[in-house]
Design a protein with these regions (language model features):
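N-terminal "domain-start" segment that seeds a small globular fold
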Residues: 1-13
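C-terminal cap of thioredoxin/glutaredoxin-like
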Residues: 2-5, 21-27, 38-46, 118-204
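Structural alpha/beta surface segment adjacent to cysteine/selenocysteine redox centers
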Residues: 24-29, 35-121, 165
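Short, flexible hinge/linker loops that cap or flank conserved catalytic cores
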Residues: 15-18
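A structure-centric feature marking long, well-folded core domains of fungal metabolic enzymes
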Residues: 9-11, 21, 65-66, 79-80, ...
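A generic helix-loop boundary/linker signal
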Residues: 13, 31, 64-65, 145, ...
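General secondary-structure edge motif
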Residues: 11, 54-55, 73, 135, ...
Length: 204
């Protein structure tokens, strides 16, 4: 089935549209490698200006991560179209990842998880680094939004895009449309600089 044409391009975007380098990251919120990669990428984001690098973050769900789909929907419900809210909430939810890993959740239900996600949405606002992350103060309001058709439709787009792009593991990185196979979850700032700096020099 083809991807329905979205109202806006898939993913959360950071940086200027005319930046010479575009980095696209596919990540899974239940994946420990995505968590590690996210933490490293955040240091790379800070090292380059918006004029140098444009970032696109795409949420996807790996088949062996049962809670990832609802975590993805929760992030979309919280962030809306706001990239900074997305970054803040993803950072927060990764800090709580052990609480919804498969092993921790094997005897619990989807409804239980929805209530945990509602707690995340409320408590994220109390974190200093996520002070503006979420507007939700009422858990019932959040759960209604989480289960809405609109959020479901938005979450499907990057998931299908990942399939079309042959992304089967996370994190996966693309630079200017080409898969960056030399970069992984463990890549340091120096590793990223070794890839990005020559590209920036060539673009001048």
């Amino acid at each position: 089935m083809a991807i329905p044409i979205p109202a806006r391009p898939s993913g959360y975007r950071l940086g200027q549209v005319d930046a010479p380098i575009m980095v696209e990251m596919f990540l899974d919120l239940e994946c420990p490698f995505s968590k590690r990669g996210w933490q490293n990428v955040m240091s790379v984001v800070k090292a380059y200006s918006p004029q140098q690098v444009r970032w696109i973050f795409q949420l996807m769900t790996l088949g062996n991560h049962r809670q990832s789909w609802d975590a993805t929907k929760a992030t979309i419900a919280v962030a809306g179209d706001d990239t900074q809210k997305f970054i803040d909430f993803v950072s927060y939810i990764f800090s709580r990842q052990e609480e919804f890993a498969n092993e921790a959740w094997k005897d619990k239900t989807q409804t239980d998880f929805h209530h945990l996600l509602a707690t995340f949405a409320v408590e994220a606002n109390k974190q200093q680094y996520a002070a503006e992350a979420t507007e939700y103060k009422d858990k019932a309001q959040f759960i209604d939004r989480l289960n809405s058709k609109d959020v479901y439709a938005q979450a499907r787009i990057p998931a299908r895009l990942a399939t079309m792009r042959s992304v089967w593991s996370t994190p996966t990185f693309f630079i200017n449309g080409a898969e960056a196979t030399s970069l992984s979850s463990g890549s340091s700032l120096e590793d990223w600089q070794a890839v990005l700096d020559p590209l920036l020099s060539a673009s001048v």
